[in-house]
Amino acid sequence: DSTFFHSGMTGLANAVFNKHDVLLVILDNGTTAMTGHQPNPGVCTSVLGEGCNHLDIESVVRGIGVTDVAKVKPFNMRGTLKTIEEMKARSGVRVIIAEEPCMLFARRTLKQNRPQVAEVATQGEEALKCLAELACPAFRRGGTAEAPVVSVDESQCSGCMVCLQVTP
């Protein structure tokens, strides 16, 4: 979201103006996570910590002229992948807004408690497939080369539960 407000709107406006065939996915995590969680025009807090008027990404996208807009919750992998496939089948300028709060921001700044830690421990080929497909930083590879095991490091698990949608 912060990058969209910083430098993405002009590219989107040009895509609409030039009638490009493009699918843009905007990752709306509610903060400027890459540089320390500073506010941006899409959040309700100013740099001084005061409430402010925030810009709604969907309204901005539609205001630029995009009519084909969808919102997804990316931790719902099936729904997100379905929406992506549907949007890929269309033409013109399309935008998907993926809305989930930054886990670090939610836990540190908003003081949200982490949900339950996922309990995943797969063995063999399924373990390697799970590790390769998701590459979660909380996954730990153990076992042997012949019998690999993947488990979850509780201290690193954000509680998103995406692994439960990917692993058997």
What are the language-model segments listed below?
Residues 110-116:
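Phosphate/pyrophosphate-recognition segments in soluble nucleotide-handling domains
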Residues 116-123, 151:
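Generic long, charged, amphipathic alpha-helical segments
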